[in-house]
């Protein structure tokens, strides 16, 4: 009994720390809006921009997750497959963006894309969409494409650590003899077959988990959308 009670106390405290802020936030939201979250969802189509905002949020979260996984997989591969000096420092540096406050990250990207910023100085004007970015926007016919690109890059930078932390341990702990044995099979002679028949089944769960978590964080992002795409809504 004492052991069970001793285990239940920290679990209860942990759940309280997670659920209490959420309950207070929902209560505050209901007080301000005058309706509960379920009513807000049911009446979403009554807002003039409600459906468009949800569609934009869903699309940018999907694109952010795809971009993050695309950039994170090679880094996770290099960290897991090869030996690096001071790999702990490298992992810590790659994890740093994820623990950076979103407002700080937004200010950093605003400094990059502002007039006279680093990207602007090399001809990439994501802020005012002139030059190359303006021509690209006219070709694809998407308004505020520069803001969207900045937002996707910020989400990828912010969530890159998720992909690395999910995928890299799986790669680094896989015994090399498994791949050597697969190479001896007829289906393992080509790199494409090894990728689709060996590595994908091994890493599928980790990759999909990283994709889902990145999508969730991008979908619920507010500060980055507020500061990097202020003209969208």
Where are these regions (language model features)?
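Membrane-water interface segments at the C-terminal ends of transmembrane alpha-helices
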Residues: 2-34, 47-172, 198-230
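Short hydrophobic, aromatic-rich alpha-helical segments embedded in or entering the lipid bilayer
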Residues: 35-42, 231-233
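General structural signal for secondary-structure boundaries
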Residues: 37, 46-47, 185-188
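Short helix-to-coil transition segments within interhelical loops
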Residues: 82, 174-203
């Amino acid at each position: 009994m004492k052991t069970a009670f001793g285990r239940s106390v920290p679990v209860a405290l942990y759940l309280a720390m997670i659920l209490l802020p959420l309950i207070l936030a929902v209560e505050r939201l209901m007080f301000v809006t005058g309706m509960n979250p379920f009513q807000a969802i049911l009446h979403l189509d009554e807002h003039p921009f409600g459906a468009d905002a949800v569609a934009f949020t869903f699309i940018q979260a999907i694109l952010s997750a795809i971009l993050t996984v695309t950039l994170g997989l090679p880094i996770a591969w290099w960290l897991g497959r090869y030996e690096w000096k001071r790999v702990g420092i490298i992992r810590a540096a790659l994890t740093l963006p994820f623990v950076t406050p979103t407002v700080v990250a937004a200010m950093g990207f605003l400094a990059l894309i502002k007039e006279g910023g680093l990207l602007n100085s090399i001809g990439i004007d994501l802020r005012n969409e002139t030059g190359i970015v303006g021509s690209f926007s006219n070709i694809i016919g998407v308004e505020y494409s520069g803001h969207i690109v900045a937002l996707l890059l910020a989400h990828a930078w912010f969530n890159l650590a998720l992909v690395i932390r999910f995928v890299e341990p799986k790669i680094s702990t896989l015994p090399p003899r498994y791949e050597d044995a697969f190479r001896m099979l007829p289906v393992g002679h080509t790199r494409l077959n090894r990728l689709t028949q060996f590595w994908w089944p091994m890493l599928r769960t980790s990759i999909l988990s990283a994709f889902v978590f990145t999508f969730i964080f991008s979908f619920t992002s507010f500060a980055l959308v507020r500061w990097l795409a202020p003209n969208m809504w």
